[in-house]
Amino acid sequence: MKLDDYQKTIVYVLYKEDNHTEELPIHDGAVRWLKQNMVITETTNQYMVSDLNNAVFPFMLNPWVVDAMQNDEELVNEFEKAYKKMESKYNKMISNRY
């Protein structure tokens, strides 16, 4: 399965959480793709949302993903590299606005 840098960033952020869980935007295509490919799953069936246009929902990494990352340091490094690349890109975008 081939992931782009944004999808790798989402997976890396979830992996770094102690419980591998985080709120993610439900209208995001990358989140939807990761869910449909069983990389992530929702942690509940119902969740209070205050802004339907920017709704978030708690997702977690599926256990097979956690196992794969715990047993493959190169994979973790690859995802961390994608995370840092996306973080740098985001920071440049923000700094150019102001």
Predicted regions and their residues:
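Short, amphipathic alpha-helical interaction segments positioned at domain boundaries
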Residues: 51-98
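Acidic-enriched, low-complexity/disordered segments with a strong bias for Aspartate over Glutamate
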Residues: 4-5, 18, 28, 42, ...
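Basic amphipathic alpha-helical segments that dock to polyanions
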Residues: 25-47
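Generic preference for hydrophobic/aromatic residues in regular secondary structure cores
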Residues: 19-24, 40, 58-59
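Sequence-level detector for tyrosine residue identity
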Residues: 6, 12-15, 47, 83, ...
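Short acidic, hydrophobic short linear motifs in intrinsically disordered regions
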Residues: 5-32
